[in-house]
């Protein structure tokens, strides 16, 4: 089964998305937190054996360098170099933001003109499912990366994991839906409480993605960095407003 993630136009697009979650000036954003979220996202994709293109890995290497510089003792020369790398990164993100806004403005003007000169296209275009309240797939992956890291630590401490030959996404989809029986919503991390190993955790997550893709589930996150909840999608159901 092919699950298509939200496509970013490149690593700067992903970083801009992460920075925008803080709703503050780019130069005031806690860059170490942004770096950790980026690296967690890339690591999660790799753990799920999903393809990560080279440019994302190059950026990951640069971010790891910035992070390591910030962890070094406060030696003046090293600090200056670390600050330069950080400021250069933030400048790249800010410059990318300006170009993206300009591109969106030009595209909007183009669409306005097209309405007067041509018939609107009738082709139906499938778009990847997004979280309600303008949350995107990346927010779901960031939440899952934290869950996966905690479960890995839990399994390592227990020293015992129950292994099976194979976990099927179709079977896990049934488990996810059954978890919502009798509930209005289910906190995402609670879905993985009974998982016995990493493979089961990942398959459960893939099943959740598939249920979102088929519009059987919706997800609610009331605020940035807040808990994500699963809800069964019902006819003409109203999503709680934040």
From Swiss-Prot:
It is found in: Cytoplasm. Its main location: cytoplasm. It comes from the Bacteria. The keyword Magnesium does not apply. The keyword ATP-binding does not apply. Keywords: Cell cycle, Cell division, Chromosome partition, Cytoplasm. Participates in chromosomal partition during cell division. May act via the formation of a condensin-like complex containing Smc and ScpB that pull DNA away from mid-cell into both cell halves. Belongs to the ScpA family. This is Segregation and condensation protein A. It comes from Streptococcus pneumoniae (strain Taiwan19F-14). The lineage of its organism: Bacteria, Bacillati, Bacillota, Bacilli, Lactobacillales.
